């Protein structure tokens, strides 16, 4: 299979095949493996990104720093590094799991469904951003507490996966601990 794909999973989270990425995301999306990463700079600010309008699901919505899908034979950590370079042009370090068993299903206003087992990580950015406009239309560095308050006050302005990740008490505490070094 050429191009990006998703790793399909059975209900127990075991690999159960692969499917082309764009064919996978429909109104009846099968359960598949993904990842989500919250990136912090040296000043302790969180990178929040706004998804490009060309994205199939949740175009123009604010979300956490970077998301994607590991490819067959690729570790989640290697996939996060690959997508951080592709979407944001950055190098990262200190990649740490903060919500390894996160799973969700959500439907965007266009009817596209996300149905993912999506381990959540935090990492430190070690280089300047060079944003890929096909992936990210805007971005903002902000304090973690400010972002958490915004997620609570206006969840409709953010991706559902970011809102759900931040609503988990343990994940929120691990993000705070990570950010404090």
Curated annotation (Swiss-Prot):
Mg(2+) binds at residue 87. Its EC number is 5.3.3.2. It is found in: Cytoplasm. One of its GO terms (biological process) is isoprenoid biosynthetic process. It catalyses: isopentenyl diphosphate = dimethylallyl diphosphate. The active site is at 67, 116. GO terms for cellular component: cytoplasm. InterPro entries: Idi_bact (IPR056375), IsopentenylPP_isomerase_typ1 (IPR011876), NUDIX_hydrolase-like_dom_sf (IPR015797), NUDIX_hydrolase_dom (IPR000086). Gene3D superfamilies: Nucleoside Triphosphate Pyrophosphohydrolase (3.90.79.10). Its cofactor is Mg(2+); Mn(2+). Mn(2+) binds at residues 25, 32, 69, 114, 116. Pfam families: NUDIX. Pathway: Isoprenoid biosynthesis; dimethylallyl diphosphate biosynthesis; dimethylallyl diphosphate from isopentenyl diphosphate: step 1/1. The keyword Lipoprotein does not apply. It is an enzyme of class 5 (isomerase). Residues 30-164 form the Nudix hydrolase domain. Catalyzes the 1,3-allylic rearrangement of the homoallylic substrate isopentenyl (IPP) to its highly electrophilic allylic isomer, dimethylallyl diphosphate (DMAPP). NCBIfam families: IPP_isom_1 (TIGR02150), PRK03759.1 (NF002995). This is Isopentenyl-diphosphate Delta-isomerase. It comes from Citrobacter koseri (strain ATCC BAA-895 / CDC 4225-83 / SGSC4696).
